[in-house]
From Swiss-Prot:
PANTHER family: DELTA-1-PYRROLINE-5-CARBOXYLATE SYNTHASE (PTHR11063:SF8), GLUTAMATE SEMIALDEHYDE DEHYDROGENASE (PTHR11063). It comes from the Bacteria. This is Gamma-glutamyl phosphate reductase. Its EC number is 1.2.1.41. Pathway: Amino-acid biosynthesis; L-proline biosynthesis; L-glutamate 5-semialdehyde from L-glutamate: step 2/2. Pfam families: Aldedh. It catalyses: L-glutamate 5-semialdehyde + phosphate + NADP(+) = L-glutamyl 5-phosphate + NADPH + H(+). Disulfide bonds: none annotated. Catalyzes the NADPH-dependent reduction of L-glutamate 5-phosphate into L-glutamate 5-semialdehyde and phosphate. The product spontaneously undergoes cyclization to form 1-pyrroline-5-carboxylate. GO terms for molecular function: glutamate-5-semialdehyde dehydrogenase activity; NADP binding. Its main location: cytoplasm. The lineage of its organism: Bacteria, Pseudomonadati, Spirochaetota, Spirochaetia, Brachyspirales. GO terms for biological process: L-proline biosynthetic process.
Length: 432
């Protein structure tokens, strides 16, 4: 099938998907989760092939270590995948919810109703779990989806997609082409030109992929280009607890977009705290880069130079900087960060309030690891990605982020001319 025909069919499916009731969608998701569990050995075998191919690409410096790590799909990740699908089942159906209701006049009722976005294209790199996450959210929100994964994960993507496609094909109410997978690099360029049919593009990958998509399409793009996340260790912080958060934020999953990349330390505790942090990171094989002020305290030769503050390592590497106060911390974050996730570690309520007010990011925390910015951890069931946009959806984007709304008026043969010429007047009585 030609790509244009697939896209047209998927667009046609969007209209039929809106009529599916919640039970049909939930039963489909439960069946997909069950089939993924039953076929996990096939999925792991496919992932093994991808990892062998990816290892060659890594050896040739064609992909990064962080991309290689994201490609791995083990037992724990698959448990999370299946749990994520089942959690989506538990969530309230976001479609056809009355968001606002106003009585404009007698027998003239305005309602704001949630509805699907339509046809969504998701382009991703080395994230085989994306297929099940995105598909489950699109099914529950009655959107059709076209998925395009990287060649490095092709076998795993096919294995998971085939399970989803077969399951949906066995449910008579589901229209064909509700969930689609395309493969070639040429497909990306063609998809980006199809603004007549595709309503939203979601890129899941590195900076170069996201920037390429944003620069080459007229279709709205939802996502983030970088994950340059910060921790600020305030002078009032509980230092031992702060160390645990620093380690978790960097080492728990270094290649994640919500892993910390820069740690800012208040000058009043720097001489005491930085040596503790150095010893902890050294023990956990985390490379540290620092500015001149930090190097006056940490004099070891293994401390590297910070070449650029706006930089995402995506590995067991981090930048360290001393700041004078909370204001300097949030100014640095707003200048060099990516508006993704930033956290203050502090016992001072005023400093916490300042930080959480003035840091211009989608996720802002106090006394918590940056790794919490995730749809599953937020209770969204799964996520299509993290958005740093300031329109439509921001932060981890779950079901609600895949809906928009329409205004419906229920009238009784009213005409505007009566209101313009004062033969009738509006009540504008808010009901909901």
């Amino acid at each position: 099938m030609q790509l244009i025909d697939l896209v047209k069919n998927a667009k046609e499916a969007t209209y039929k998907l809106q009529s599916l009731n919640t039970d049909i969608k939930n039963n489909a998701l439960l069946e997909i989760a069950k089939k993924i569990e039953e076929n996990k050995d096939k999925i792991f075998e496919a992932n093994k092939k991808d990892l062998e191919y990816a290892q060659k690409l890594l050896d040739e410096n064609k992909i990064s270590k962080s991309m290689f790590n994201r490609l791995k799909l083990d037992e724990n990740k698959l448990i999370d995948v299946v749990s994520g699908i089942r959690d989506v089942v538990k969530l309230e159906d976001p479609i056809n919810k009355v968001l606002l209701e106003t009585e404009l006049d007698d027998n003239l009722l305005l309602k704001k109703i949630s509805c699907p976005i339509g046809l969504i294209a998701v382009i991703f790199e080395a994230r085989p779990d994306v297929i099940s996450q995105i598909s489950s959210l699109c099914i529950k929100s009655s959107n059709a989806v076209i998925l395009k994964g990287g060649s490095e994960g092709e076998n795993t993507n096919k294995a998971i997609y085939n399970i989803i496609e077969e399951t949906l094909n066995n449910i008579k109410e589901f229209p064909k082409n509700s969930v689609n997978l395309v493969f070639t690099r040429e497909d990306i360029k063609e998809l980006l030109s199809m603004d007549k049919y595709i309503d939203l593009i979601i890129p899941r990958g590195g900076n170069s992929l996201v920037q390429y998509i944003k620069s080459n399409t007229n279709i709205p793009v939802l996502g983030h280009a970088d994950g340059i996340c910060h921790l600020y260790i305030d002078e009032s912080a509980d230092q031992e607890k702060a160390l645990k958060i620093c380690l978790d934020s960097k080492a728990q999953y270094p290649s994640a977009c919500n892993a910390v990349e820069t740690i800012l330390v208040n000058k009043n505790i720097a001489s005491e705290y930085l040596p503790k942090l150095y010893n902890l990171f050294k023990e956990n094989e985390i490379k540290m880069n620092a500015d001149a002020e930090v190097k006056k305290i940490l004099t070891s030769s293994d401390i590297g130079e910070v070449k650029e503050w706006h930089f995402e390592y995506g590995d067991k590497e981090v930048s360290l900087k001393i700041v004078s106060d909370t204001e300097e911390a949030y100014n640095h974050i707003n200048k060099y960060g990516s508006h993704h996730t930033d956290s203050i570690i502090s016992e001072n309520k005023d400093n916490i309030e300042k930080f959480m007010t003035f840091v211009d990011s989608a996720n802002v925390y106090c006394n918590a690891s940056t790794r919490f910015s995730d749809g599953f951890r937020y209770g969204f069931g799964a996520e299509v990605g993290i958005s740093t946009n300031k329109t439509h959806a921001r932060g981890p984007v779950g079901l609600e982020g895949l809906t928009i709304y329409k205004y419906k008026i229920f009238g009784n043969y009213q005409i505007v001319d009566d209101y313009v010429n004062h033969r009738a007047s509006f009540k504008h009585k808010r009901i909901k």
